[in-house]
């Protein structure tokens, strides 16, 4: 069985801790802000830019994978920031849901 560790907390703070400890990750799964100001919340004020994704890359082993969720209206900005930071965009997985259906 593989060994894994789930890290929860402020992303940049935790990433810098990993880098300082010379610990490298195989993959990153993240759901960053979509930049839609969801329900007027401060945490959804913008989309992480190039610098954010550069820091994430510094904590990754060569060949690591990144899975980042994004909103349909701002996904293009997220993807460009990731690519500008040096990540290779290989594939895009989309779940396009027009509306939530009621189950009887």
Question: Where are the predicted features?
Answer:
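Core catalytic lobe of class I
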Residues: 2-104
